[in-house]
C-alpha cells in the first residue's frame, strides 16, 4: 500500500515534506490493549502486536490464521510512504485565507505579507515549480486563480473549471496543471457533502498571458495523476486503467474524451494494483497484491501492448529508476530483488537480474534521487535492521546495519549521503518500561543514518515526529513535533545538522502543521495552527528564527 507524505496544500503551500495525520499505534477495540493518551492508531504493521496488522483505517486488526505457510498468518503488507520533495515557491509562502476569499503571500526574506482576492472559500493551493507563482482553487464556483508576484503587487488570471474539485497537480516543468476530484481525500476530510465528478478533469495551461482551461473526460474515478519528466503528458490513474493526456494538444484543440488504457484484467480490484509510469512516459509498471507476476504496459507509442515478468514471490514493493530505464521489484517471501530493464527485460525476461537478499532486510525499497543507492527495510514486522544496496556498481554490493528501533518510513537526503528513518513505536507508555530496550521501543523517535558508515543517531522525541524536510544541500533536516492543541502540549521544530548529528529544539508558539523550504530566501518555514495564522521561518545558515502572526485577518494584512 502506498501512502503519500505531502504537505497539506489545502492550507498552505510553498511547500514540502507533507505528512499524514499523526497519532499512531492501536487501541483497545482492535488489539485488546488500552491505548496511551494521544496514541490511538497505527501507520505500519510493526506498530502492532504480533499476530495483528495495521488496516486501511489506521487500526491494528487481528490477522486471519492458516493462510500462510504451515498454517501461520500471511505476513502483513508493506506500507509505502512517498516523501515528495519540496514543491516550493522560490521566496514566498502562500496561505489560503478561506473565510476572507483571499490568498496571503508571505515574503520569506522580509516577512512582508500581501493579500490578493481570489475565488470563493479557497482551500487548495499549489505553487508553480521554478517560479514564485501559485494556483488556488475556490470551493464553490468552479474557478482557478493563477497568482504571480509583480513587484509589490500580484497579477491574477481567473479560469473556469469544473465545480467541486479538490486536487491540483502541476507538472514538474510548471507549464500545465490537472485539477480533479479525489473521493478518498474528500472522505478523509469529512467533506463528502461536496462531491465532484468521478470522470471529468480540468487541464490548465499556465503560460503567463496565455493561460487556458479545458475540461476533459477520463476513466472512472481518478486515483492519482502522474507526469512524464518533460511535462508533456499527464497520466490519470483510474479504476479502469490509465488515461493519457497530451497536455499541449489538449489545451490547443477541442476537448475530447480520453479513454483509459487497460493495465490489468478488469476482474482485479483496483485496490490491489500499484501503477507507476516511468519518467519517459512510455511504459507503466503494474504490481498486483499477492501476485508473483509483474506487468509492463505501453502507455505511449503502442498503447496497451503488455509484457509479463514472473518473480520468485509476490512483489511487496516496486520502484522506478529516475531515468525511466529500470524497475526494481522487492520480493519479501523469496528474499530477492529483481532488476528489470525497461522495456528490454519485459520483452525478454531472461535478462532480468535477481539479487539474493538472504541476509538483508526485505520488504520495502527507497531510492536516492540519483537512483544510485537503495535503502531496504520493512515496516510489516519489527526488524531493527536496514540494508543499503549500491545499484550503480557491478554485483550490486549490499550492507546490512543494525539500528535501535524498527522503521516506519525512510527518506534519503537530496545529497544521497544520509537518510532519515522515521521509527515505529511499540504500544505502551515509556514511563512504564522495565528495561532500557523496552523504553526505546515504546518511545517516539527518528534516526539519522550515515550511508557511508551505517552509523545511526537515534533521537527520542516526546511526541510522534511529524512533517519534515531536508535542506536542499542535505546538510540539515527540519522535523516538526506536534503534540496537539492543548496549551501545555509539545510544539517545536527540531533542526538536525547531518554532519554532526546535533539536534536543536526550537519552541514554537503554536502546533506545527507543515514544514518546507524557500530556496530563494534561504529559509525553512513552519506553518502552525493559529486562529489568526502563524508561520515561523528558520535561516538555513545561522538557524535564526522569526515568526509572522496575524495575516488571517484583514486588519492585520500588510498591503
Sequence positions of predicted segments:
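Accessible peptide chain termini
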Residues: 1, 29-31, 219
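C-terminal motif of bacterial Sec signal peptides marking the signal peptidase cleavage site
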Residues: 12-14
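Predominantly soluble domains enriched in secretory-pathway, periplasmic, or organellar proteins
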Residues: 16-24, 50, 55-559
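Secreted, propeptide-processed cysteine-rich mini-domains
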Residues: 23-44
Amino acid at each position: 500500500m502506498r501512502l503519500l507524505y505531502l504537505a497539506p496544500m489545502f492550507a498552505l503551500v510553498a511547500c514540502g515534506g507533507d505528512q499524514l495525520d499523526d497519532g499512531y499505534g492501536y487501541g483497545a477495540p482492535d488489539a485488546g490493549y488500552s491505548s496511551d493518551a494521544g496514541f490511538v492508531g497505527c501507520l505500519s504493521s510493526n506498530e502492532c502486536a504480533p499476530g495483528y496488522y495495521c488496516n486501511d483505517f489506521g487500526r491494528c486488526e487481528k490477522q486471519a490464521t492458516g493462510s500462510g505457510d504451515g498454517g501461520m498468518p500471511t505476513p502483513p503488507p508493506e506500507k509505502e510512504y512517498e516523501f515528495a520533495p519540496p514543491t516550493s515557491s522560490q521566496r514566498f509562502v502562500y496561505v489560503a485565507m478561506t473565510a476572507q476569499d483571499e490568498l496571503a503571500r508571505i515574503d520569506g526574506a522580509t516577512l512582508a505579507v500581501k493579500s490578493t482576492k481570489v475565488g470563493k472559500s479557497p482551500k487548495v493551493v499549489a505553487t508553480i515549480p521554478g517560479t514564485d507563482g501559485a494556483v488556488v482553487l475556490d470551493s464553490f464556483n468552479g474557478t482557478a486563480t493563477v497568482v504571480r508576484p509583480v513587484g509589490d503587487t500580484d497579477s491574477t488570471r481567473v479560469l473556469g473549471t469544473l465545480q467541486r474539485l479538490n486536487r491540483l497537480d502541476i507538472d514538474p516543468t510548471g507549464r500545465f496543471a490537472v485539477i480533479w476530484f479525489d473521493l478518498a481525500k474528500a472522505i478523509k476530510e469529512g467533506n463528502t457533502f461536496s462531491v465532484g465528478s468521478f470522470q471529468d478533469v480540468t487541464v490548465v495551461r499556465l503560460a503567463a498571458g496565455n493561460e487556458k482551461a479545458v475540461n476533459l473526460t477520463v476513466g472512472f474515478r481518478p486515483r492519482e495523476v502522474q507526469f512524464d519528466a518533460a511535462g508533456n503528458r499527464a497520466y490519470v490513474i483510474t479504476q479502469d486503467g490509465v488515461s493519457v493526456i497530451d497536455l499541449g494538444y489538449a489545451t490547443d484543440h477541442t476537448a475530447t474524451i480520453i479513454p483509459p488504457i487497460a493495465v490489468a484484467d478488469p476482474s482485479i480490484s483496483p485496490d490491489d494494483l500499484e501503477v507507476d509510469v516511468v519518467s519517459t512516459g512510455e511504459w507503466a509498471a503494474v504490481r498486483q497484491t499477492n501476485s508473483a507476476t509483474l506487468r509492463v504496459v505501453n502507455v505511449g507509442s503502442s498503447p496497451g501492448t503488455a509484457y509479463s515478468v514472473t518473480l520468485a514471490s509476490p512483489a511487496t514493493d516496486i520502484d522506478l529508476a529516475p531515468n525511466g530505464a529500470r524497475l526494481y521489484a522487492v520480493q519479501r517471501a523469496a528474499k530477492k530483488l529483481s532488476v528489470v530493464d525497461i522495456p528490454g527485460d519485459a520483452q525478454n525476461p531472461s535478462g532480468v537480474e535477481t539479487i539474493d537478499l538472504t541476509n538483508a532486510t526485505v520488504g520495502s525499497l527507497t531510492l536516492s534521487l540519483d537512483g544510485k543507492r537503495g535503502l531496504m527495510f520493512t515496516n510489516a514486522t519489527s526488524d531493527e535492521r536496514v540494508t543499503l544496496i549500491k545499484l550503480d556498481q557491478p554485483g550490486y554490493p549490499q550492507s546490512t546495519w543494525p539500528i535501535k528501533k524498527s522503521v516506519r518510513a525512510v527518506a534519503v537526503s537530496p545529497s544521497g549521503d544520509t537518510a532519515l528513518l522515521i521509527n515505529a513505536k511499540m504500544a505502551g507508555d515509556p514511563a512504564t518500561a522495565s528495561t532500557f530496550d523496552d523504553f526505546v521501543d515504546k518511545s517516539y523517535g527518528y534516526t539519522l543514518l550515515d550511508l557511508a558508515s551505517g552509523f545511526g543517531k537515534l533521537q527520542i522525541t516526546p511526541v510522534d515526529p511529524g512533517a519534515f524536510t531536508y535542506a536542499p544541500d542535505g546538510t540539515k533536516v527540519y522535523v516538526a513535533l506536534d503534540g496537539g492543541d492543548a496549551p501545555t502540549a509539545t510544539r517545536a521544530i527540531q533542526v538536525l545538522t547531518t554532519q554532526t548529528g546535533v539536534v536543536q529544539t526550537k519552541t514554537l508558539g503554536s502546533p506545527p502543521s507543515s514544514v518546507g523550504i524557500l530556496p530563494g530566501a534561504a529559509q525553512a518555514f513552519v506553518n502552525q495552527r493559529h486562529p489568526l495564522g502563524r508561520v515561523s521561518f528558520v535561516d538555513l545558515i545561522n538557524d535564526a528564527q522569526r515568526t509572522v502572526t496575524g495575516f488571517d485577518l484583514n486588519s492585520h494584512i500588510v498591503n
